[in-house]
């Protein structure tokens, strides 16, 4: 045994020891944290999957790897563990006890949004600090007030006319109409109208706009982007992969937004103050330089475009597509709706008077039922238990615990909505509907209610009224017996709603 051999062996063992020590140093905190989460955490006695208690990666597994949506598992887990409260993460629980919705979302609630959940989000809905949220919402509120939204009806009518012309061209060419794309074009056009003081057209021809194609691609990776944002950025550098396409889509989306923003800013700086219409960009430029605190609380408009397009167009387009599917799948619902629209055809075809359209009772019932059954934002949106903790059933939750009660837990609660999986607009009409509006919660409730609620209702009411008043339509059957959807933070249909135009009743 030579001295050289001993020295070489010692050298190799030293490197082995260094590598082993490094691995242990990196892994030990994770192992210890996992042991704590499962066996010593204050939530250790809450029923639920052990893997969910161990790590938040369990939610990511369902949301992105399985691409099914973790929220779609909650009902099964509540049934499996026979409990109204389950542990869905190391520091998060979900409850089906509907009375806690009033506790969490009441006016003056001290239940703040969960920083750990929203840490990679931006924009209005992700703001945790109450002052920042109030400042930004107050800054934008006039754009989404009822009076301002009423003024958007002529713009929407013009877009609907263009869309109808395109649908008729497709019909004459023997093509089916992809309503998902038609509706996304309409809803995105409306939100861009508020974001920028420009006339941005997404509907000049029959081709789907590249901006919308890019946005759709981005939404397929939403959970990866908001959970581990650096991963897609790094993997996108690998040529030929789906992540490279993601990078290309992001570039396309960003280039359009930047170009619109720069053009808008330039025109407004060169114009008289009253010569451009109100928008996010105009309001930002109107901020006073000496109000530093307010300017700090309000993001640069370009930084919030994605959030408003996702929240202000994708959810509305999805919900409207679901409405088309359910109406056309139910002959009775379709007949009742068309009868009401025919009785008031002049306010749709001739006047396009939104103040009158919004008061049509059966149309409103159809929309409320669609919002209930389609669940546009289906997932967990955790709020933090305030100081003092809270007791849910037999379980005590300490301050700092994340608590969720999803829209699904309420919308499919049989005590509130009998036959919850059936599309029944009639449940929202007459004596049996008394008190039911309390549970029309698609836009949330309280001071954090969606700022775009009035805009969404304008689109839902006018789009459905216009198309069902004008066209006789039928589904092609591509969706089958039910719509398949997935939770990508907002709900996304896996099948586009395709239909045929049977007749144009206005010609």
UniProtKB/Swiss-Prot annotation:
It is found in: Membrane. It is an enzyme of class 1 (oxidoreductase). Its EC number is 1.-.-.-. Disruption phenotype: Causes a blockage in the conversion of clavines to D-lysergic acid. Abolishes the production of the peptide alkaloids ergotamine and ergocryptine but accumulates substantial amounts agroclavine accompanied by varying amounts of elymoclavine and chanoclavine which ranged between 10 and 20 percent of the amount of agroclavine formed. Also leads to traces of chanoclavine aldehyde. GO terms for biological process: indole alkaloid biosynthetic process. Glycans are attached at residue 247. Keywords: Glycoprotein, Heme, Iron, Membrane, Metal-binding, Monooxygenase, Oxidoreductase, Transmembrane, Transmembrane helix. Belongs to the cytochrome P450 family. This is Cytochrome P450 monooxygenase cloA. Pathway: Alkaloid biosynthesis; ergot alkaloid biosynthesis. It holds the Pfam family p450. Coiled coil: none annotated. One of its GO terms (cellular component) is membrane. Cytochrome P450 monooxygenase; part of the gene cluster that mediates the biosynthesis of fungal ergot alkaloid. DmaW catalyzes the first step of ergot alkaloid biosynthesis by condensing dimethylallyl diphosphate (DMAP) and tryptophan to form 4-dimethylallyl-L-tryptophan. The second step is catalyzed by the methyltransferase easF that methylates 4-dimethylallyl-L-tryptophan in the presence of S-adenosyl-L-methionine, resulting in the formation of 4-dimethylallyl-L-abrine.
């Amino acid at each position: 045994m030579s001295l050289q051999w001993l020295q070489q062996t010692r050298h190799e063992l030293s490197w082995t020891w260094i590598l082993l020590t490094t691995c242990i140093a990196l892994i030990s905190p994770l192992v210890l944290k996992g042991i704590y989460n499962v066996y010593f955490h204050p939530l250790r006695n809450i029923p639920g999957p052990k893997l969910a208690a161990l790590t938040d990666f369990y939610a990511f597994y369902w949301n992105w790897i399985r691409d099914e949506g973790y929220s779609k598992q909650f009902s099964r887990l509540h049934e499996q563990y026979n409990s109204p409260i389950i542990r869905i993460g190391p520091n998060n629980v979900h409850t089906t006890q509907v009375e806690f919705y009033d506790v969490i979302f009441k006016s003056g609630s001290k239940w703040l949004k969960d920083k750990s959940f929203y840490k990679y989000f931006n924009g209005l809905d992700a703001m945790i600090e109450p002052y920042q949220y109030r400042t930004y919402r107050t800054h934008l509120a006039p754009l989404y007030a009822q009076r301002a939204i009423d003024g958007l009806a002529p713009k929407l009518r013009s877009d609907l006319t263009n869309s109808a012309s395109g649908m008729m061209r497709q019909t004459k060419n023997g093509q089916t109409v992809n309503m998902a794309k038609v509706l996304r074009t309409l809803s995105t056009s409306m939100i861009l109208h508020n974001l920028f003081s420009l006339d941005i057209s997404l509907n000049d021809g029959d081709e789907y706009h590249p901006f919308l194609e890019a946005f759709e691609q981005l939404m397929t990776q939403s959970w990866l982007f908001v959970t581990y944002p650096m991963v897609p950025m790094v993997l996108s550098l690998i040529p030929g992969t789906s992540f490279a396409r993601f990078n290309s889509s992001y570039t396309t989306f960003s280039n359009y937004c930047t170009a619109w923003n720069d053009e808008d800013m330039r025109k407004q700086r060169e114009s008289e103050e009253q010569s451009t219409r109100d928008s996010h960009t105009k309001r930002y430029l109107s901020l006073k330089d000496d109000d530093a605190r307010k300017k700090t609380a309000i993001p640069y408009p370009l930084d919030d475009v994605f959030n408003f397009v996702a929240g202000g167009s994708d959810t509305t387009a999805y919900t409207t597509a679901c409405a088309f599917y359910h109406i056309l799948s139910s002959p009775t619902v379709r007949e009742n709706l068309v009868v009401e629209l025919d009785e008031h055809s002049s306010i749709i075809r001739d006047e396009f008077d939104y103040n009158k359209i919004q008061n049509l009772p059966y149309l409103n019932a159809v929309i409320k039922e669609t919002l209930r059954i389609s669940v546009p934002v289906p997932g967990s949106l955790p709020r933090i238990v305030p100081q003092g903790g809270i007791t849910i059933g037999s379980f005590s939750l300490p301050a700092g615990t994340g608590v969720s009660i999803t829209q699904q837990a309420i919308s499919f609660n049989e005590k509130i909505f009998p036959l919850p999986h059936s599309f029944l607009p009639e449940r929202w009409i007459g004596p049996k509907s008394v008190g039911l509006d309390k549970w029309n919660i698609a836009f949330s409730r309280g001071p954090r209610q969606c700022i775009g609620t009035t805009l969404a209702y304008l689109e839902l009411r006018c789009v459905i009224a216009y198309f069902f008043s004008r066209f006789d339509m039928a589904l092609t059957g591509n969706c089958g017996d039910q719509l398949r959807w997935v939770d990508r933070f907002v709900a996304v249909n896996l099948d586009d709603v395709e239909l045929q135009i049977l007749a144009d009743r206005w010609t």
